[in-house]
A protein has these predicted regions:
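Short internal beta-strands
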Residues: 166-172, 328-331, 352-363
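C-terminal helical cap/extension that packs against the catalytic core
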Residues: 346-376
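A short acidic, helix-capping loop that chelates divalent metal ions and anchors anionic groups
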Residues: 98-99, 141-146, 337-338, 362-369
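Short, intrinsically disordered, charge-balanced linker/junction segments flanking boundaries
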Residues: 1, 76-79, 370-376
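Phosphate-binding loop of NTP-binding sites
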Residues: 10-13, 21-190, 259, 266, ...
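Acidic-glycine-rich active-site phosphate/pyrophosphate-binding loop
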Residues: 212, 218-241
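Nucleotide phosphate-binding/pyrophosphate-handling subdomain across enzymes
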Residues: 235-355
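Beta-strand->loop->alpha-helix junctions that form or flank phosphate-binding loops
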Residues: 3-6, 41-48, 90-93, 186-221, ...
Protein backbone atom coordinates (compact mmCIF):
# COMPACT_ATOMS: atom_id res chain seq x y z
CA UNK A 1 0.00 0.00 0.00
CA UNK A 2 1.30 3.42 -0.95
CA UNK A 3 0.44 6.21 1.48
CA UNK A 4 0.63 9.86 0.49
CA UNK A 5 2.03 12.20 3.10
CA UNK A 6 4.09 11.52 6.22
CA UNK A 7 1.75 10.60 9.07
CA UNK A 8 2.19 8.63 12.30
CA UNK A 9 -0.78 6.39 11.48
CA UNK A 10 1.08 5.02 8.44
CA UNK A 11 3.39 2.96 10.66
CA UNK A 12 0.80 1.66 13.12
CA UNK A 13 1.10 -2.09 13.58
CA UNK A 14 4.23 -2.39 11.46
CA UNK A 15 7.13 -4.58 12.58
CA UNK A 16 9.86 -2.76 10.67
CA UNK A 17 10.25 0.75 9.30
CA UNK A 18 12.91 1.35 6.63
CA UNK A 19 14.23 4.88 6.11
CA UNK A 20 16.81 6.63 3.94
CA UNK A 21 19.27 9.38 4.81
CA UNK A 22 16.82 11.90 3.36
CA UNK A 23 14.49 11.25 6.31
CA UNK A 24 15.15 13.36 9.39
CA UNK A 25 14.83 12.10 13.01
CA UNK A 26 11.82 14.37 13.60
CA UNK A 27 9.85 12.78 10.75
CA UNK A 28 6.42 11.89 12.23
CA UNK A 29 6.61 8.29 11.05
CA UNK A 30 10.08 7.80 12.55
CA UNK A 31 8.98 9.40 15.82
CA UNK A 32 5.89 7.16 15.96
CA UNK A 33 7.94 4.06 15.18
CA UNK A 34 10.34 4.88 18.01
CA UNK A 35 7.47 5.41 20.44
CA UNK A 36 5.88 2.11 19.43
CA UNK A 37 9.15 0.22 19.80
CA UNK A 38 9.16 -0.82 16.17
CA UNK A 39 12.39 -1.86 14.48
CA UNK A 40 13.87 1.00 12.44
CA UNK A 41 16.38 0.05 9.74
CA UNK A 42 18.36 2.19 7.29
CA UNK A 43 17.80 1.47 3.60
CA UNK A 44 21.47 0.58 3.15
CA UNK A 45 21.17 -2.26 5.69
CA UNK A 46 18.31 -3.80 3.72
CA UNK A 47 20.22 -3.43 0.46
CA UNK A 48 23.28 -5.07 2.04
CA UNK A 49 21.13 -8.06 3.06
CA UNK A 50 19.76 -8.37 -0.48
CA UNK A 51 23.30 -8.29 -1.88
CA UNK A 52 24.31 -11.21 0.30
CA UNK A 53 21.72 -13.37 -1.46
CA UNK A 54 22.81 -12.43 -5.01
CA UNK A 55 25.87 -11.90 -7.19
CA UNK A 56 25.99 -8.18 -6.53
CA UNK A 57 27.48 -5.43 -8.66
CA UNK A 58 27.65 -1.99 -7.07
CA UNK A 59 28.20 1.31 -8.86
CA UNK A 60 29.72 4.09 -6.78
CA UNK A 61 31.13 7.51 -7.63
CA UNK A 62 30.38 11.19 -7.59
CA UNK A 63 29.03 11.08 -11.16
CA UNK A 64 27.64 8.46 -13.51
CA UNK A 65 26.16 6.03 -10.97
CA UNK A 66 22.63 6.04 -12.31
CA UNK A 67 23.59 5.86 -15.98
CA UNK A 68 26.20 3.13 -15.50
CA UNK A 69 23.96 0.97 -13.32
CA UNK A 70 21.08 1.53 -15.76
CA UNK A 71 23.27 0.44 -18.67
CA UNK A 72 24.31 -2.75 -16.89
CA UNK A 73 20.72 -3.53 -15.90
CA UNK A 74 19.65 -2.89 -19.51
CA UNK A 75 22.32 -5.26 -20.84
CA UNK A 76 21.27 -8.02 -18.46
CA UNK A 77 17.53 -7.51 -19.04
CA UNK A 78 17.89 -7.62 -22.83
CA UNK A 79 20.76 -10.06 -23.33
CA UNK A 80 21.05 -12.06 -20.11
CA UNK A 81 20.58 -15.80 -20.36
CA UNK A 82 20.32 -18.45 -17.67
CA UNK A 83 21.30 -17.07 -14.28
CA UNK A 84 22.06 -13.67 -15.84
CA UNK A 85 18.48 -13.24 -17.05
CA UNK A 86 15.88 -11.28 -15.09
CA UNK A 87 18.31 -9.42 -12.80
CA UNK A 88 17.33 -7.51 -9.70
CA UNK A 89 18.31 -3.85 -9.60
CA UNK A 90 18.09 -0.83 -7.33
CA UNK A 91 18.78 2.33 -9.32
CA UNK A 92 18.21 6.00 -8.57
CA UNK A 93 15.98 6.63 -11.57
CA UNK A 94 13.87 4.94 -14.23
CA UNK A 95 15.46 3.48 -17.35
CA UNK A 96 14.50 4.40 -20.92
CA UNK A 97 14.71 0.92 -22.32
CA UNK A 98 14.47 -0.82 -25.64
CA UNK A 99 11.68 0.35 -27.97
CA UNK A 100 10.89 3.25 -25.64
CA UNK A 101 9.79 1.08 -22.71
CA UNK A 102 10.25 2.73 -19.31
CA UNK A 103 11.56 0.44 -16.59
CA UNK A 104 11.24 1.37 -12.94
CA UNK A 105 14.47 1.94 -11.04
CA UNK A 106 13.75 -1.02 -8.78
CA UNK A 107 13.03 -4.63 -9.70
CA UNK A 108 13.14 -7.92 -7.79
CA UNK A 109 14.15 -10.45 -10.43
CA UNK A 110 14.41 -14.23 -10.37
CA UNK A 111 17.99 -14.26 -11.66
CA UNK A 112 21.03 -14.38 -9.41
CA UNK A 113 22.45 -10.91 -10.19
CA UNK A 114 21.72 -7.67 -8.33
CA UNK A 115 22.84 -4.31 -9.73
CA UNK A 116 22.76 -1.45 -7.25
CA UNK A 117 23.85 2.13 -6.92
CA UNK A 118 26.16 2.44 -3.92
CA UNK A 119 25.51 5.80 -2.33
CA UNK A 120 28.67 7.37 -0.97
CA UNK A 121 27.01 10.62 0.15
CA UNK A 122 26.59 9.47 3.76
CA UNK A 123 29.20 6.71 3.85
CA UNK A 124 26.58 3.95 3.82
CA UNK A 125 28.30 2.12 0.95
CA UNK A 126 30.81 0.89 3.53
CA UNK A 127 28.20 -1.77 4.42
CA UNK A 128 28.28 -3.44 1.01
CA UNK A 129 30.36 -6.48 0.00
CA UNK A 130 29.65 -6.97 -3.72
CA UNK A 131 31.32 -9.41 -6.08
CA UNK A 132 32.11 -6.52 -8.42
CA UNK A 133 32.51 -2.87 -7.45
CA UNK A 134 32.41 -0.23 -10.20
CA UNK A 135 33.85 3.16 -9.22
CA UNK A 136 33.10 5.75 -11.89
CA UNK A 137 35.11 8.50 -10.19
CA UNK A 138 36.04 9.77 -6.77
CA UNK A 139 36.21 13.48 -7.36
CA UNK A 140 35.56 15.37 -4.13
CA UNK A 141 31.86 15.73 -3.28
CA UNK A 142 29.68 15.51 -0.18
CA UNK A 143 32.30 17.38 1.81
CA UNK A 144 29.52 18.31 4.24
CA UNK A 145 29.76 14.69 5.38
CA UNK A 146 33.43 13.82 4.81
CA UNK A 147 35.06 17.14 5.65
CA UNK A 148 38.11 16.68 3.42
CA UNK A 149 38.96 15.26 0.02
CA UNK A 150 41.34 12.76 1.65
CA UNK A 151 38.55 11.39 3.86
CA UNK A 152 36.28 11.11 0.82
CA UNK A 153 38.82 9.11 -1.18
CA UNK A 154 39.67 6.92 1.81
CA UNK A 155 36.04 5.80 1.82
CA UNK A 156 36.44 4.58 -1.78
CA UNK A 157 39.63 2.71 -0.89
CA UNK A 158 37.64 0.94 1.82
CA UNK A 159 34.73 0.23 -0.54
CA UNK A 160 37.04 -1.25 -3.20
CA UNK A 161 38.50 -3.57 -0.60
CA UNK A 162 35.06 -5.06 0.01
CA UNK A 163 34.69 -6.36 -3.57
CA UNK A 164 35.25 -10.12 -3.55
CA UNK A 165 35.90 -10.66 -7.28
CA UNK A 166 36.86 -7.47 -9.10
CA UNK A 167 37.01 -3.69 -8.99
CA UNK A 168 36.31 -1.71 -12.18
CA UNK A 169 37.55 1.91 -12.11
CA UNK A 170 37.64 4.80 -14.56
CA UNK A 171 41.23 5.94 -15.10
CA UNK A 172 40.25 9.31 -16.57
CA UNK A 173 39.54 10.62 -13.07
CA UNK A 174 42.52 11.80 -11.02
CA UNK A 175 40.70 10.98 -7.81
CA UNK A 176 40.30 7.39 -8.95
CA UNK A 177 43.99 7.15 -9.79
CA UNK A 178 44.80 8.32 -6.27
CA UNK A 179 42.43 5.68 -4.89
CA UNK A 180 43.97 3.01 -7.15
CA UNK A 181 47.49 3.76 -5.94
CA UNK A 182 46.32 3.55 -2.33
CA UNK A 183 44.82 0.08 -2.75
CA UNK A 184 46.32 -2.98 -1.15
CA UNK A 185 48.33 -4.95 -3.73
CA UNK A 186 45.86 -7.84 -3.63
CA UNK A 187 42.90 -5.56 -4.36
CA UNK A 188 44.79 -3.64 -7.05
CA UNK A 189 45.69 -6.94 -8.70
CA UNK A 190 42.01 -7.70 -9.31
CA UNK A 191 41.24 -4.16 -10.48
CA UNK A 192 40.42 -3.23 -14.07
CA UNK A 193 40.98 0.35 -15.19
CA UNK A 194 39.06 1.67 -18.21
CA UNK A 195 40.33 4.89 -19.76
CA UNK A 196 40.61 6.99 -22.89
CA UNK A 197 44.32 7.38 -22.03
CA UNK A 198 47.08 4.87 -22.68
CA UNK A 199 49.34 3.25 -20.10
CA UNK A 200 52.15 5.78 -20.57
CA UNK A 201 49.76 8.67 -19.96
CA UNK A 202 48.25 7.05 -16.88
CA UNK A 203 51.51 6.14 -15.18
CA UNK A 204 51.59 3.81 -12.19
CA UNK A 205 48.53 1.52 -12.19
CA UNK A 206 49.62 -0.41 -9.09
CA UNK A 207 49.32 -3.75 -10.90
CA UNK A 208 45.82 -3.15 -12.31
CA UNK A 209 44.76 -4.20 -15.83
CA UNK A 210 44.04 -1.49 -18.42
CA UNK A 211 41.13 -1.56 -20.89
CA UNK A 212 41.54 1.36 -23.28
CA UNK A 213 38.66 3.31 -24.83
CA UNK A 214 39.28 4.67 -28.33
CA UNK A 215 36.72 7.20 -29.56
CA UNK A 216 35.89 6.88 -33.24
CA UNK A 217 34.47 10.34 -33.93
CA UNK A 218 34.89 14.00 -33.03
CA UNK A 219 31.15 14.61 -32.82
CA UNK A 220 27.96 12.63 -32.22
CA UNK A 221 25.91 14.73 -34.64
CA UNK A 222 24.45 11.59 -36.23
CA UNK A 223 22.92 10.77 -32.87
CA UNK A 224 25.36 7.95 -32.16
CA UNK A 225 28.58 7.69 -30.16
CA UNK A 226 31.12 5.23 -31.59
CA UNK A 227 34.12 3.83 -29.77
CA UNK A 228 36.30 0.73 -29.51
CA UNK A 229 37.29 -1.17 -26.37
CA UNK A 230 40.81 -2.61 -26.39
CA UNK A 231 40.68 -5.57 -23.99
CA UNK A 232 44.03 -7.24 -23.20
CA UNK A 233 44.47 -10.98 -23.43
CA UNK A 234 43.90 -12.88 -20.22
CA UNK A 235 41.07 -10.71 -18.95
CA UNK A 236 38.08 -12.39 -20.60
CA UNK A 237 39.95 -14.83 -22.80
CA UNK A 238 43.46 -15.66 -23.92
CA UNK A 239 43.44 -13.36 -26.94
CA UNK A 240 43.38 -9.56 -27.03
CA UNK A 241 39.95 -8.28 -28.10
CA UNK A 242 38.86 -5.16 -29.98
CA UNK A 243 35.16 -4.52 -29.34
CA UNK A 244 33.32 -1.92 -31.43
CA UNK A 245 30.53 -0.18 -29.51
CA UNK A 246 27.77 2.16 -30.70
CA UNK A 247 25.69 4.22 -28.26
CA UNK A 248 22.54 6.21 -28.89
CA UNK A 249 23.36 8.49 -25.96
CA UNK A 250 26.04 11.11 -26.70
CA UNK A 251 29.18 12.07 -24.81
CA UNK A 252 32.59 10.63 -24.02
CA UNK A 253 31.39 10.29 -20.42
CA UNK A 254 28.74 7.86 -21.65
CA UNK A 255 31.41 5.88 -23.53
CA UNK A 256 33.15 5.53 -20.17
CA UNK A 257 29.90 4.52 -18.43
CA UNK A 258 29.12 1.94 -21.10
CA UNK A 259 32.66 0.54 -20.92
CA UNK A 260 32.23 -0.15 -17.20
CA UNK A 261 28.86 -1.82 -17.79
CA UNK A 262 30.18 -4.01 -20.63
CA UNK A 263 33.23 -5.10 -18.62
CA UNK A 264 31.03 -5.95 -15.63
CA UNK A 265 28.66 -7.99 -17.81
CA UNK A 266 31.63 -9.89 -19.25
CA UNK A 267 33.01 -10.63 -15.78
CA UNK A 268 29.58 -11.96 -14.79
CA UNK A 269 29.88 -14.44 -17.65
CA UNK A 270 28.18 -12.79 -20.62
CA UNK A 271 29.90 -12.83 -24.01
CA UNK A 272 31.47 -9.40 -24.43
CA UNK A 273 30.20 -9.00 -28.00
CA UNK A 274 26.68 -9.80 -26.83
CA UNK A 275 26.98 -7.21 -24.04
CA UNK A 276 28.27 -4.51 -26.38
CA UNK A 277 25.46 -5.18 -28.86
CA UNK A 278 22.85 -4.98 -26.09
CA UNK A 279 23.97 -1.56 -24.86
CA UNK A 280 23.29 -0.07 -28.32
CA UNK A 281 19.54 -0.05 -27.63
CA UNK A 282 19.95 1.79 -24.33
CA UNK A 283 18.11 5.11 -24.68
CA UNK A 284 19.17 6.64 -21.37
CA UNK A 285 18.30 6.94 -17.72
CA UNK A 286 15.59 9.36 -16.67
CA UNK A 287 16.83 12.95 -16.52
CA UNK A 288 20.22 12.05 -17.96
CA UNK A 289 20.42 13.88 -21.30
CA UNK A 290 16.71 13.15 -21.69
CA UNK A 291 15.30 14.88 -24.76
CA UNK A 292 11.88 16.18 -23.75
CA UNK A 293 10.92 17.42 -27.20
CA UNK A 294 11.58 19.86 -30.03
CA UNK A 295 9.44 22.90 -30.78
CA UNK A 296 10.21 25.52 -33.46
CA UNK A 297 13.70 24.01 -33.93
CA UNK A 298 14.43 24.31 -30.19
CA UNK A 299 15.35 20.99 -28.56
CA UNK A 300 14.80 20.76 -24.80
CA UNK A 301 17.11 18.42 -22.87
CA UNK A 302 16.51 17.57 -19.20
CA UNK A 303 19.47 16.52 -17.05
CA UNK A 304 20.03 16.06 -13.32
CA UNK A 305 23.66 17.26 -13.51
CA UNK A 306 24.32 19.01 -10.20
CA UNK A 307 28.13 18.89 -9.81
CA UNK A 308 30.52 21.04 -11.90
CA UNK A 309 32.11 18.00 -13.55
CA UNK A 310 28.69 16.61 -14.48
CA UNK A 311 27.66 19.96 -15.95
CA UNK A 312 30.87 20.18 -17.98
CA UNK A 313 30.35 16.64 -19.31
CA UNK A 314 26.71 17.42 -20.13
CA UNK A 315 27.60 20.55 -22.08
CA UNK A 316 30.43 18.76 -23.90
CA UNK A 317 27.93 16.05 -24.88
CA UNK A 318 25.47 18.69 -26.07
CA UNK A 319 28.20 20.23 -28.25
CA UNK A 320 29.02 16.83 -29.72
CA UNK A 321 25.37 16.05 -30.42
CA UNK A 322 24.37 19.54 -31.63
CA UNK A 323 27.60 21.14 -32.91
CA UNK A 324 25.80 23.78 -34.99
CA UNK A 325 23.40 24.90 -32.27
CA UNK A 326 23.52 27.46 -29.51
CA UNK A 327 23.45 25.92 -26.05
CA UNK A 328 21.26 27.75 -23.54
CA UNK A 329 21.14 26.51 -19.95
CA UNK A 330 18.67 26.95 -17.10
CA UNK A 331 20.48 25.74 -13.99
CA UNK A 332 19.11 25.17 -10.49
CA UNK A 333 21.92 24.62 -7.94
CA UNK A 334 21.42 21.67 -5.59
CA UNK A 335 22.38 22.14 -1.91
CA UNK A 336 23.75 25.27 -0.25
CA UNK A 337 26.86 23.38 0.86
CA UNK A 338 27.73 22.16 -2.65
CA UNK A 339 27.13 25.62 -4.09
CA UNK A 340 29.52 27.12 -1.53
CA UNK A 341 32.21 24.46 -1.93
CA UNK A 342 32.25 24.59 -5.73
CA UNK A 343 31.14 28.11 -6.67
CA UNK A 344 34.20 28.79 -8.87
CA UNK A 345 33.99 25.37 -10.51
CA UNK A 346 30.29 25.90 -11.29
CA UNK A 347 31.14 29.18 -13.03
CA UNK A 348 33.83 27.50 -15.14
CA UNK A 349 31.57 24.62 -16.13
CA UNK A 350 28.59 26.81 -17.02
CA UNK A 351 30.87 29.00 -19.14
CA UNK A 352 30.78 26.20 -21.73
CA UNK A 353 27.21 27.29 -22.58
CA UNK A 354 26.27 30.25 -24.77
CA UNK A 355 23.70 31.61 -22.30
CA UNK A 356 22.95 30.70 -18.68
CA UNK A 357 20.04 31.40 -16.33
CA UNK A 358 20.63 30.45 -12.68
CA UNK A 359 17.54 29.93 -10.52
CA UNK A 360 17.24 29.74 -6.73
CA UNK A 361 19.06 26.96 -4.87
CA UNK A 362 17.18 23.71 -4.23
CA UNK A 363 17.91 23.07 -0.52
CA UNK A 364 16.96 19.36 -0.33
CA UNK A 365 17.99 18.27 3.19
CA UNK A 366 19.63 21.61 4.09
CA UNK A 367 18.33 24.85 5.61
CA UNK A 368 19.34 28.25 4.28
CA UNK A 369 19.83 29.70 7.77
CA UNK A 370 22.71 27.26 8.27
CA UNK A 371 24.52 28.86 5.32
CA UNK A 372 24.26 32.63 5.85
CA UNK A 373 27.09 33.26 3.39
CA UNK A 374 25.19 31.62 0.51
CA UNK A 375 22.55 33.61 -1.36
CA UNK A 376 19.43 31.47 -1.86
Amino acid sequence: TVEFGQQAKNVEGKNTVVFSSAIKPDNPEIVAAHEAGERIVHRSDILALLMNAKRAVTVAGAHGKTTTSSMLAHILVNAGEGELADPSYAIGGSIQGKDGAILDGGHAGKGNVLVAEADESDGSFAKYHPQIAIITNSEADHLDHYGTQDNYRAAFVDHAGHATKAVIMCGDDEGNLAVLRALDATVAGRTIVYSTRNAAELGDLNGATLVRIESESETAESGAEHFTLHIPGGLIGEEERRIAVTLTVPGIHNARNASAAIIAAALLGMDVERASAAVTSFLGAARRFQVRGTVSQVTVVDDYAHHPTEIAALLDAARRRYPQSKIRVIFQPHLFSRTRFFSSEFAQALAKADDVIVTGIFPAREKQEDFPDVTP
